[in-house]
């Protein structure tokens, strides 16, 4: 029986890692230059881990790693660009096996967000140690509310060309992330690599004027970056979660969330569709140059 985890919504990353020695552990953290990514990197590094910090721009990663000031290797990696991913993965390979990979929530719209994660995580998973390695993938709040359209919404309009609603398709991307983690955990089970997804909370990166207004009002009631980083830090490094895999986590606890997250058949279908889409998208070098898939052109939003 799994032991109770004595942490919750108010816990911080430093608290969940108190007393955990991460010396000689090598961990990749994406989106390391701000918010939850920076807080996760800081906490893991403070406990002795060697952090490989990824940001879309090398100078952003360098600035973040310099500010954190411990054992850190900054790398630039634009997950929507094939060459950038290739270079980053090759650099990481040269540093040695990974003990954990933490994929934080990004600012990209549905297809770019999910497919970029799909490709990057699959590439990095080859570098994760068997038996003890961990992969942790972030999912935003909207994944809890998007399931009312049913599973067809995951496949019939992947890019949102026919009806574009930022919250709806952001949520669809994050549900896809949770399903991806579920299927990846199944595929890596034989290697002994644990894969879990977690709720990032509001990232503060959504870009419409209305969304920014809402965020300005609610930011006083939301968790701090250190509190939001508690769950990924727990999943990446705590001995309390050894052997736990394929689960969705929120506030340092396992959470059912959207029931579609447990649909193994849907997870397999999405994996197959994602693999085909990724082959098309990365065949052109960048996401924005990708050909159409299921008669929908690829759309991303990074502004």
List each language-model region with its residue ranges.
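Polar helix-capping/helix-linker motif
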Residues: 81, 157, 237-238, 262-264
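Short coil/turn segments at secondary-structure junctions
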Residues: 108, 163-164, 168, 213-219, ...
